[in-house]
Amino acid sequence: PEMSFEIVSINKFIQFYFCVPRELKEFVEGQFYAQYPTVEISAADDYTEKIFEEKYAVGYDVQTTKEDVYPIKTFQSFEVDPLSGITSVLSQLSANEEVWIQICVSPASDQWQKKATSFVKAIKSGNDPNEPIWKTILGGLGTIAKTVSAPPTQTASAPTQVDISGPAALAMSGIETKSTKLGFKSKIRVISLSGDYHRARANAGSVAGVLKQFTQTNM
């Protein structure tokens, strides 16, 4: 099933929405109450169905720049709640401006976990998995030094030993940690509305900028 979680600023008022299958409604509500005991949840009309007059809309989809086995930053990596950066941008909008941020998720199969596990094993053993991601790690994560040694009495080469350090080691650790979690297919969309095109574009850019805080720059 697909679920949608949204952060919206309308008339200088920041609101949070979620849309899930009816059979998951109570479960999802329970998750919110567990984390935020004082939260108030109620049914709401679809804010996207209203008529917009004399407003410009600028929108885009957010995509990762690396293969999906790589992790993004999660809340454990932040000293300050990353949500505050997003709400700070939304709080600066004018009364006639709006920004919608939508995150659509649906459960993913275990194939991505198998891909991550196979990738890490291949790198550690010195084998080339013959995948584009292998080129990514070589080109973007630093040099992987290979030390090959063989007994002097044998003509066959011994198994390759791979020394991994620096950003590559951090990447391996991050990929291994991520592969132990449940996975979701996700899509992030952003729409900015304003009576002025340049303001709509600028607000959309501000949201894009704050979303970059989830990038793992050391990988």
Task: Cite the ranges covered by each PLM segment.
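Extended, folded cores of ATP/NTP-driven motor/assembly subunits in large transport
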Residues: 1-219
